């Protein structure tokens, strides 16, 4: 129960920091950057019902996506240890990688190179690449330190268990059994670190995506975004759900993590609707704030997708035993990246 509370506190802290970061974005827009009021797609009255549809549709698809892996152990052909689940997980990892490279990173480049920003310093230094690079390195540090702390805690707990009489029975087990237990324990710790860090990264960019959709009154843009984001959230949820499943959390913690993933984007949309009259997505402050958040999120998602998800699976024993399965998983990952690349046309 304590770990669940800690996890909830982490998520609330991230959401609070994002709120403070976005609040200065309520500012004036330079005349040359103002939206063309004669555009037939700009209609606040028609946009509101579409945004409400978006909240419901994205909430439902997010719940389906993140919940599907959690119930897969009850479906024989989708068992977490099976080949089909591995292929689906690689596809979902490809979705996350495609999100970082084809959606979040380009958005950051576009925002931080906007003509609405001053030449000095925004047009004289590649801030997006720099911040994304730092984000990847910081994620590596967090990943490493968190794993180290989890491992030390597990070793301490194991030492306490050794002081009990139960160790007499355990010592009679074959060495290979104890080694296997130790290996499984270390792998479980890695899964838990991955699930936590990935969820925090997804929450950051989900709030930004939702805010952008909620703040815009462009009905043409909203219509395309609804379908694209439903697809995106469903399969990104499958990737996260697979990590949560492998982490073997308690049912309460699984529910908490799934709940926060499902409601983050709809909450961002609701926040965008509330701020739509004062929030200007092309104001300098908004461009800088959201652009830097996107760069941070992109670095984190790219690192997690490549290092903690795809590389970990491809170098794992299951895929290393079968070249055919490796090719199938590579094709699935490529398909996931390709799907997000196609969606980049609309979202």
UniProtKB/Swiss-Prot annotation:
Entry membrane topology: Multi-pass membrane protein
GO cellular-component term (any): plasma membrane
Side Extracellular, residues: 28-51, 105-124, 214-224, 276-286
Main location: membrane
A GO term, aspect molecular function: zinc ion transmembrane transporter activity
Membrane-crossing segments per the record: 52-72, 84-104, 125-145, 193-213, 225-245, 255-275, 287-307, 327-347
Signal peptide: 1-27
Location of the protein in the cell: Cell membrane
Pfam families: Zip
InterPro entries attached to this UniProt entry: ZIP, Zn/Fe_permease_fun/pln
UniProt topological domain (Cytoplasmic) ranges: 73-83, 146-192, 246-254, 308-326
The keyword Ion transport appears for this protein: yes
Key words of the record: Cell membrane, Ion transport, Membrane, Signal, Transmembrane, Transmembrane helix, Transport, Zinc, Zinc transport
GO biological process, one term: zinc ion transmembrane transport
Free-text function comment from the UniProt entry: Probably mediates zinc uptake from the rhizosphere.
Family membership: Belongs to the ZIP transporter (TC 2.A.5) family.
Protein name in the entry: Probable zinc transporter 8
Lineage: Eukaryota, Viridiplantae, Streptophyta, Embryophyta, Tracheophyta
């Amino acid at each position: 129960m304590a770990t669940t509370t800690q996890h909830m506190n982490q998520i609330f802290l991230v959401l609070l920091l994002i709120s403070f970061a976005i609040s200065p974005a309520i500012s004036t827009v330079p005349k040359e950057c103002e939206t063309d009021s004669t555009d037939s797609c700009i209609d606040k009255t028609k946009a509101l019902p579409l945004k409400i549809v978006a909240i419901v549709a994205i909430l439902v698809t997010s719940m389906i996506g993140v919940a599907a892996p959690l119930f897969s152990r009850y479906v024989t052909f989708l068992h977490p240890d099976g080949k089909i689940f591995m292929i689906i997980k690689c596809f979902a990892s490809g979705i996350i990688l495609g999100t970082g490279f084809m959606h979040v990173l380009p958005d950051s480049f576009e925002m931080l190179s906007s003509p609405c920003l001053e030449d000095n310093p925004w047009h004289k230094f590649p801030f997006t690449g720099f911040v994304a690079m730092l984000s990847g390195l910081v994620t590596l540090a967090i990943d490493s330190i968190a794993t180290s702390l989890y491992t030390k805690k597990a070793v301490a707990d194991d030492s306490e268990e050794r002081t009990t009489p139960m160790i007499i029975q355990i010592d009679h087990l074959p060495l290979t059994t104890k080694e296997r237990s130790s290996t499984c324990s270390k792998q479980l710790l890695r899964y838990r670190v991955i699930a936590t860090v990935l969820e925090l990264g997804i929450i950051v960019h989900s709030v930004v995506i939702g805010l952008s959709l909620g703040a815009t009154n462009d009905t043409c843009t909203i219509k395309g975004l609804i379908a694209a984001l439903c697809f995106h959230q469903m399969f990104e949820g499958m990737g996260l759900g697979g990590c949560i499943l492998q982490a073997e959390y308690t049912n309460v913690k699984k529910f908490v993590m799934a709940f926060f993933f499902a409601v983050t984007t709809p909450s961002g949309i609701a926040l965008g609707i509330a701020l739509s009259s004062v929030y200007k997505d092309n104001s300098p402050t908004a461009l800088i704030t959201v652009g830097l958040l996107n760069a941070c999120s992109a670095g984190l998602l790219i690192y997690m997708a490549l290092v903690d998800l795809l590389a970990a699976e491809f170098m794992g024993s299951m895929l290393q035993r079968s070249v055919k399965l490796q090719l199938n998983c590579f094709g699935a990952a490529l398909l996931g990246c390709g799907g997000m690349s196609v969606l980049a046309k609309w979202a």
